[in-house]
Amino acid sequence: MKNIFEKSNDVNGINFFNGEEKVDFIDEKFLRKGKIGLPQTSELEVLRHYKQLSDKNFCIEKGFYPLGSCTMKYNPKVNEMLANLEGFLNIHPHLKDEDVQGALELMYKLQEALKVVTGMDCVTLQPAAGAHGEFTGMMIVKKYFDSIGEDRKKVIIPDSAHGTNPASAKMAGFDSVEVKSNEKGQVDIEALKALLDKDVAAIMMTNPNTLGIFEENVLEISKLMHENGSLLYYDGANFNAIMGYTNPKLMGFDIVHLNLHKTFSTPHGGGGPGAGPVGVVDKLKDFLPVPVITFDGEKYHRNYNLANSIGNVKGYFGNFGVLIRAYAYILMMGKDLKQVSADAVLNANYIKEHLKNDFKIPYDEPCMHEFVLSGDLQKEKGISTLNMAKRLMDSDIHPPTIYFPLIVHEAMMIEPTESENKERLDEFINVMQKIAKEVQENPEIILSAPNSAPVKKIDETLAARKPDLNYRMEE
């Protein structure tokens, strides 16, 4: 398929001006002297081009999307209708509180709902993504220890953690210290004890962790950290597994971020938008970003008066459109959020049990909402996890997350979510088993994959080292 520049012809899609108008409000040295170099196509051809591109995209509405740790669940379309209501769509952030009471009410009630599901005492909706929530949480940790006169420098992070955890800690001014996993894929308690000293500010954990395994010693970890004067940070990337069964507060965490674009069904991918609200226990509430939304019994307000606030972490009030969608999802599901987690865990275990004889399971424990396979057995035959991921594309299935977590060789992280029915799960199982068989009997078809995708084999090394990121039209 040609790119839009290659489709350019002598037809003008739009006439800007005849070139005689003078632009006297911009210094002449900043004005373009040559041609703009934009493609010239008709409106119809532009529409056709981008429609053809959209047809090549893969999305949850098009097929199975088992992208581990991303929770690619179905996003109900009624949420889109609600987010596009005129009263939400056309309001301006500079309007006074009395003019946006409906929007503030929604945000306040979303804060309250997130307090219920997490057990936290106070919530901010500002952060725009999970990693942004992590950074916000780490800034709160930093400000807390500054307020009590302690200059702690270390944050402990499990070796199975998301890569954003050490990055967020570093950005907030901490040094990350890795704690190893044990033979069950959980935090090694003895290794953790050896790392604890008065320079440790916090531990960042995901529970269930990125192996899809529940950290069964979390209460002991909480006790150890608190006895050391340290805080516990909960990465909510895998929160879809535990709703209604437990919450971060019960596990002993002090700070939590949630990914509304994962657990609470708002569309994501392609860089955003997202939302990563942060909740804290009572002793940390004054460190939250401002404003937080409050209710005095009659009216809703934006409260900027938090004594030790870390300040503003996002323009205005967060990604409001995402907040609307998430609140709608919570209202729709209600107490059935617990069933969401039950179904997500059931679906993951169903697939895992059917694939355990065809692929290596590095940690053969009952999993939660996702699990990790290893392609080590297939690698011995010359077929890598990357090869198998590309072969999945020939069956209109999005590849799972691969080569993560880093502690698993040839990793494939599979998360079906609660959205998929048994027929779809069986289809995926059959395709994976077929690929395992092809490794033995017909490896060439895997090595040539994807065979049905619009873009076939690419030179990944060349693309990484010499990316061609723009197009220069000929004069």
Annotate each PLM feature.
Residues D121-P127, K154-I157:
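A short, small-residue-rich loop immediately preceding and capping a beta-strand
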Residues M1-C122, T246, D296, R302-V313, ...:
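Non-catalytic terminal extensions of PLP-dependent enzymes
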Residues G102-E105, H132-E298, N308, G382-I383, ...:
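Conserved PLP-enzyme active-site core in the AAT-like
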Residues T71, A129, N209, N238, ...:
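Short, flexible loop/turn elements at secondary-structure junctions
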Residues F58-N79, Q126-E134, F264-G279, F317-A328, ...:
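Conserved phosphate/anionic-ligand binding catalytic regions in large, soluble enzymes, centered on
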Residues T124, V177-V179, P400:
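General small-molecule cofactor/ligand-binding pocket signal
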Residues N209, K314-F317:
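Acidic/His-rich catalytic or pseudo-catalytic neighborhoods
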Residues K109, F135-T136, I140, G321-R325, ...:
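Short amphipathic alpha-helical face segments that pack within enzyme cores
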